[in-house]
């Protein structure tokens, strides 16, 4: 490694007349060398730098265009969402109004149904009362006729002889059969 370093140092000490060498003294370099280096950099670097700047410009413009498209799309989506929100609000209000109407309608139907049920129960009660009254009247009549018949038989038994007694019993049995047929 030391040989390589020595060879570079020896190049710096060569005389400038008739030979080519590197001048390691930065302050001693002349304006021409700097101009040549800058010219080479500008000539070869100009295309690369121009391409880099053009690519960067295209990317920036494309990003701006994409951002604008996304912004327009976002505005459209926002408008659609607002329209959907208005529609949902309208439907909700309609459901609310319909809900109140349905509740009132159900309430009226329930009241009407309850009234009809109570009326039917009242009719059934009255019919049952009439039936029970008829049954009680029938039973009272039956008992009355039985008592009257027993009294009549008792009176007849005390007053009549056997032959008259048998004829009376036969007649009463016939009357009872007729009464039974009428009531059935």
Swiss-Prot record:
Membrane topology of the entry: Single-pass membrane protein
Subcellular location: Plastid membrane
Keyword Signal carried by entry: no
This protein's GO CC annotations: plastid membrane; proton-transporting ATP synthase complex
Listed Pfam families: ATP-synt_B
Keyword field: ATP synthesis, ATP-binding, CF(0), Hydrogen ion transport, Ion transport, Membrane, Nucleotide-binding, Plastid, Transmembrane, Transmembrane helix, Transport
GO biological process, one term: proton motive force-driven ATP synthesis
GO MF annotation list: ATP binding; proton transmembrane transporter activity
Major location (coarse): plastid
Record carries keyword Transmembrane helix: yes
Transmembrane feature ranges: 27-49
Domain of life, source organism: Eukaryota
Purpose: F(1)F(0) ATP synthase produces ATP from ADP in the presence of a proton or sodium gradient. F-type ATPases consist of two structural domains, F(1) containing the extramembraneous catalytic core and F(0) containing the membrane proton channel, linked together by a central stalk and a peripheral stalk. During catalysis, ATP synthesis in the catalytic domain of F(1) is coupled via a rotary mechanism of the central stalk subunits to proton translocation.
Subunit annotation: F-type ATPases have 2 components, F(1) - the catalytic core - and F(0) - the membrane proton channel. F(1) has five subunits: alpha(3), beta(3), gamma(1), delta(1), epsilon(1). F(0) has four main subunits: a(1), b(1), b'(1) and c(10-14). The alpha and beta chains form an alternating ring which encloses part of the gamma chain. F(1) is attached to F(0) by a central stalk formed by the gamma and epsilon chains, while a peripheral stalk is formed by the delta, b and b' chains.
The family this protein is said to belong to: Belongs to the ATPase B chain family.
Entry protein name: ATP synthase subunit b, plastid
